[in-house]
Amino acid sequence: MTRTATLLSGILVCFASCAAPDSEPAMEEEAAPMLNTLTDEERAEGWTLLFDGKSLDQWRGFRSQETPEGWEINDDSIHYTGKVRAGDILTREQYGDFDLRLEWKVLEAGNSGIFFRASEEYESLWYTGPEMQVLDDAGHRDGARRETSAGANYALHPPSKDVVRKAGEWNQVGIVAHGNHVEHWMNGEKIVEYELRSEDWKKRVAASKFKDLPHYGLMDKGHIVLQDHSDPVWFRNIKIRKLD
């Protein structure tokens, strides 16, 4: 090694030791994100909350003006306890074209769902409303079949990617419905895309459990629904923006 190289090496060592303090200053922790709120920007874009963390005023039971027993506010969330058969809850307002965002979590082997454009005209909400599956894939038998796994258009369209988080963790999901075009999003990824009323749609429905339901997926407007499937489930940060 030359004398010049030795000198440069010493300078670099000195610079490194002098520049680095004995201990890093304490970093301020980032504030936890506010739950069940909207930013000014979101309000300006047309978003509205479907749950403010304080009341269930925007939700009710099937063919009822009351929220059924078994649904409550817990952990800043809309929570179905699983202790009684309560039935699904639905938004008081109906939506046609929309962008829906929310978060959900379930326990091990938990099962629930999110329906849209659902009608009370028929015997059950699932007779008309397509469902985005809510599921612990690892713990529930439906997770073994892609068409019924988390994020799927239940029993019809499987998710293209496996991005669901493990039981007990929050998943960020979205449903975008614009005319016949529908997208399912989960944890930042678009995982399902389909066209209502298309030949592909008709073929899939005809080969499914929905084959005898003539209005399935064909309502132009309907309710957003959170499903009672007997298992505990939590929903929070529920917001929607109309696209029509």
Give the residues covered by each predicted segment.
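Positively charged n-region of N-terminal signal peptides that target proteins for export
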Residues: 1-4
